[in-house]
UniProtKB/Swiss-Prot annotation:
Keywords: Adaptive immunity, Cell membrane, Disulfide bond, Endosome, Glycoprotein, Immunity, Immunoglobulin domain, Membrane, Signal, Transmembrane, Transmembrane helix
Topology with respect to the bilayer: Single-pass type I membrane protein
Protein name per the record: T-cell surface glycoprotein CD1c1
Protein's gene: CD1C1
Keyword Electron transport recorded: no
Main location: membrane
Biological role stated in the UniProt entry: Antigen-presenting protein that binds self and non-self lipid and glycolipid antigens and presents them to T-cell receptors on natural killer T-cells.
Length: 332
């Protein structure tokens, strides 16, 4: 819900967008996926995210940050960004060396994959909270509390040994603390300020209905398609009058190449009960004007159009044939 966060961002930065502060949280975080095939081979993937919007990538060949938007630099200077770039490079390299040189101490068993997420969350402009979460092969491994790494129960002795090793390096602990408590919040606010024109945009959804036969005879699977909307938060429900149909099933919200979103919401219903159903869509771009499509109305319009146009076309064809015949007889 990025567009809502600007309501309190303006207050934090001393702007004048609104006098009301919306109680919303927003986070910026970096994600890491490192695959270790053996002692000599590792592949790193890195990315940066503003809530659910990817803002940065990581080129593992050149060890450089990829800025995915014109505003992805926030308000940081080139020097600050270069320092962060060097820091990420040192982190990836140092982690790989540590794992390769101390396999027995860390109980390393190849192959394995490390997934990590580190960043900060801004709570309505009041305070920030830093976080680090890491998993190995999909199982929780460690988290961050009070300037220290804390092992997760699922991580076992491996997690305990890794955290004990990390926590002995006071300089690294202070650097991590500074990054998530100072650097990250400043960068987050800079992103929101630099990208507000793009992040605040509102794109109305297009909505249409369809159906497909169900495996069970006499039933239909009704689908409400909502496409091309931005921002991502949206509410879609099958309705009968003012009554929400609790059997409504929502699919995943999928991205389009242009940054907008697509959603499909379905309802399994007896064919004889389909009449009177409608799909209702609420989105910030619509303000208070919900989109409501009634099942069967579109079909009725098509049938009416078909019933009017087809006889008209046939009549025109018959008139042309009759005229042609009369002309031919006149020549004879």
């Amino acid at each position: 819900m990025l567009f809502l966060h600007f309501l309190f961002l303006d207050v934090v930065l001393g702007g004048s967008i609104t006098e009301n502060v919306v109680q919303e949280n927003i986070s910026f975080y970096v994600m890491q996926i490192s695959s270790y095939a053996n002692k000599s081979w590792v592949q790193n993937h890195g990315s940066g995210w503003l809530d659910e919007l990817q803002t940065h990538g990581w080129d593992s060949e050149s060890d450089k940050i990829i800025f995915l938007h014109t505003w992805s630099r926030g308000n940081f200077s080139n020097e600050e960004l270069e320092d962060l770039q060097l820091l990420f490079h040192a982190y990836f390299s140092g982690l790989a060396l540590r794992i390769q040189h101390q396999p027995s101490q860390l109980e390393v068993k190849y192959p394995f994959e490390v997934q990590a997420r580190a960043g900060c969350e801004l709570h309505s402009g009041e305070h920030t909270k830093g976080f680090i979460h890491a998993a190995v092969n999909g199982l929780n491994f460690l988290s961050y509390q009070n300037k220290s790494l804390v092992p997760s129960p699922e991580g076992g002795t491996r997690a305990q040994k890794f955290c004990d090793l990390f926590n002995t390096y006071e300089g690294i602990r202070e650097t991590v603390y500074y990054l998530i408590r100072d650097t990250c919040p400043r960068f987050l606010l800079g992103l929101l300020d630099a990208g507000k024109m793009d992040l605040q945009r509102q794109v109305r959804p297009e909505v249409w209905l369809s159906s497909s036969p169900n495996l069970e005879p006499g039933r239909l699977l009704l689908a409400c398609h909502v496409s091309g909307f931005y921002p991502k938060p949206i509410w879609v429900m099958w309705m009968r009058g003012a009554q929400e149909q609790l059997e409504t099933k929502q699919g995943d919200i999928l991205p389009h190449a242009d940054g907008t979103w697509y959603l499909r919401v379905t309802l399994d219903v007896a064919a004889r009960e389909a009449a009177g159903l409608s799909c209702r869509v609420r989105h910030s771009s619509l303000r208070d004007q919900d989109i409501i499509l009634y099942w069967g109305h579109g079909l009725s319009v098509i049938l009416i159009t078909f019933a009017v146009i087809v006889p008209l076309v046939l009549l025109i064809v018959l008139m042309l044939l009759y005229k042609k015949r009369c002309t031919y007889q006149g020549i004879q």
